[in-house]
């Protein structure tokens, strides 16, 4: 049986595999849309746990959790971080075919080296392994960005946000270009 989301995930032809592995895989990433908080990049925040990484500001994940019927307390409310994570694990387990399913597992593999599919049954093991890594120096916000070879990233800020973090990032020693990109929701 083929491994779950292996190095050739989504690469179905020999040409695709050659183009990706011999060219694109080594190229720097130009991240034109993300949910990263410029303040957390500036401060080089050390995330407390996987819930803070995944559910701190991602409306796509929140929407999926709402569609699963979870209470707002388990999504953006004051519930315990582990309980929020378990709700997200159950959501992902039921999201096969949704891009969130693939994104979640790519993040687990690329950042944490975890190849076990996220589910309620595997949640505790994944939580413990990922959180142990999040407490190391290699897993600060800036190091996570740099270790993925990001050369440019554009945050999606609120039009009313103060841009002082962007200016400070441009003047800091971080070696990525970080222009502001505003996204208006109508």
Model-inferred region functions:
Residues 174-186:
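Single conserved hydrophobic/aromatic residue that forms the stacking wall/gate
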Residues 17-25, 163-173:
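Short amphipathic alpha-helices and their capping/turn segments at secondary-structure boundaries
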Residues 1-84:
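An N-terminal structural lobe/cap that precedes and organizes the functional/catalytic core
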Residues 35, 157-158, 181:
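Active-site beta-loop-alpha junctions enriched in small/polar residues
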Residues 41, 165, 185-186:
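Short glycine-/acidic-enriched loop or helix-start segments at secondary-structure transitions
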Residues 47-170:
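Alpha-helical scaffold segments that flank or form the walls of functional sites
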Residues 30-32, 154-155, 177:
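Hydrophobic faces of well-ordered beta-strands that scaffold small-molecule active sites
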């Amino acid at each position: 049986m083929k491994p779950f989301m292996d190095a050739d995930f989504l690469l179905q032809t020999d040409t695709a595999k050659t183009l990706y592995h011999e060219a694109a895989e080594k190229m720097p990433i130009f991240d034109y849309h993300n949910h990263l908080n410029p303040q957390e990049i500036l401060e080089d925040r050390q995330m407390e746990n996987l819930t803070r990484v995944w559910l701190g500001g991602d409306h796509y994940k929140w929407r999926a959790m709402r569609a699963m019927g979870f209470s707002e307390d388990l999504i953006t409310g004051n519930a315990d971080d582990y309980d929020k994570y378990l709700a997200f694990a159950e959501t992902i387990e039921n999201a096969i075919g949704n891009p969130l399913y693939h994104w979640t597992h790519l993040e687990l593999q690329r950042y944490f080296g975890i190849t076990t599919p996220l589910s309620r049954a595997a949640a505790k093991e994944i939580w413990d392994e990922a959180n142990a890594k999040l407490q190391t120096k290699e897993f600060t916000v800036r190091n996570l960005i740099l270790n993925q070879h990001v050369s440019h990233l554009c945050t999606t800020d609120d039009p009313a946000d103060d841009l002082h973090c962007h200016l400070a990032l441009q003047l800091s020693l971080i070696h990525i270009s970080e222009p502001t990109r505003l996204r208006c929701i109508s």
